[in-house]
Amino acid sequence: MRMELIENLLQLLVTFVGALLSGISYRKSGRHAYFLLLCFYGCFALGALYWTLYLLLFDTTPRVFYVSEFGWVASVIFLRILQATLASQDERSFRCRRAWLAPAFGVPLLAFYCTFGDILSNLIWCGMMIWLSFCAIRGLVYANGQTGAARNMRCFHIGVLCFAGSEYLLWTAGCFWPDTSPASPTFWCDMLLTLAILGLLPATRKAVDA
């Protein structure tokens, strides 16, 4: 439990710093992309804050996890809005067969996760990850065909794919190894997710300059 607390404190710190830096960037530049990134980090931090405080006060994981989930779901919604905001009209209308890898990979995982947990929660989370991944793959393929600053969007799309992939890894590991000690793959998958969340800040900065 102590390692889970340290892990959640680290995630809370990363999201708080991300929100702070995004807010500073928004204040300096006035770009709406930074405001949306601030909302992403802020909502994720609120979810992590509830989880961390519960661990501190009661030395156990929250029984009512929906409180944190509201914050985390909201953060992913803001990430999707950010993704749509940064995409050009040509990118949004770009047709890419490889983007269908997202549902081809995500739907079987959804069926698998539903055997372990709440069906509605899994539908919401996997649906959002499939949507994010679909748009990220399409955007990455589109950006690879561009020249100059437009190619900087690749970093953002890769960052979103790393975030979605880390979420999938964490959920899958949690099904087999619910323990959160450093000996468990779940612990390291959660650390990987924290790094992916942190990486979205420089990736967004590069995309804004595209």
Task: Give the ranges of each region predicted by the language model.
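Internal transmembrane alpha-helix with an interfacial aromatic "cap," most often the third helix
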Residues: G18-S29, W51-L101, I137-L140, L200-D209
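Alpha-helical transmembrane segments of multi-pass integral membrane proteins
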Residues: C39-G47, G71-A84, F94-G117, G127-C135, ...
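C-terminal transmembrane-bundle signature of multipass membrane proteins
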Residues: F134-A210
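Hydrophobic transmembrane alpha-helical segments in integral membrane proteins
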Residues: M1-V17, F116-C126
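Membrane-interfacial loop-to-transmembrane alpha-helix junctions, especially the N-terminal start
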Residues: K28-Y41, E91-L101, T147-G159, D209-A210
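Membrane-interface helix caps and helix-loop-helix hairpins in membrane proteins
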Residues: L56-R63, F112-L123, F176-T180
